[in-house]
A protein has these predicted regions:
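Adenine nucleotide-associated cytosolic modules
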Residues: 1-147
Length: 147
């Protein structure tokens, strides 16, 4: 999110109901001892506004519900969506809403237990391996007729 803000993206919507905890410190830039137990969306919003005060930011401290996702995607003309949801049902709902509304999506998969950032790759979901979350996403998408 931070590089996109630095690159000059003018509008960002962030929806997250999670708070920062110790396990986030090794992999999330906003996770510090000084930010523990604070809403991730609030800390990220402060950082983004500090990088780009002109940024139009919609930061919502809530877990996104499956039922709301389609409406949010349909009612907003996003150039692309970055999915960092780690719960399967809302992740699938977001992916399918983006596909249905022809909105580009970049979806992160499992990072838990990973320690070598040089092994991060970008691939179509059909080309992923050694990731339980990606496997579950693939399987669920296949049951919906999405390849």
């Amino acid at each position: 999110m931070l590089p996109k803000c630095r690159a000059g993206i003018g509008n960002i919507t962030i929806i997250d109901g999670d708070t920062i905890n110790k396990t986030n410190i090794n992999r999330q830039l906003i996770a510090l001892h000084s930010t523990l137990n604070q809403p991730k969306v609030n800390i990220l919003a402060q950082r983004l506004q500090d990088i780009n005060p002109e940024l139009i930011l919609d930061a919502q401290y809530q877990f996104i519900e499956k039922e709301e996702i389609d409406k949010i995607i349909k009612n907003n003309r996003y150039d692309f969506v970055v999915d960092a949801i780690d719960t399967l049902s809302p992740k699938i709902a977001l992916i399918t809403a983006c596909l249905k509304n022809k909105t580009k999506i970049i979806s992160s998969m499992g990072a838990g237990g990973r320690i070598d950032p040089s092994k991060i790759t970008f691939a179509d979901i059909s080309e992923t391996y050694h990731c339980g979350l990606a496997k579950a996403v693939r399987k669920r998408l296949q049951t919906l007729g999405i390849k």
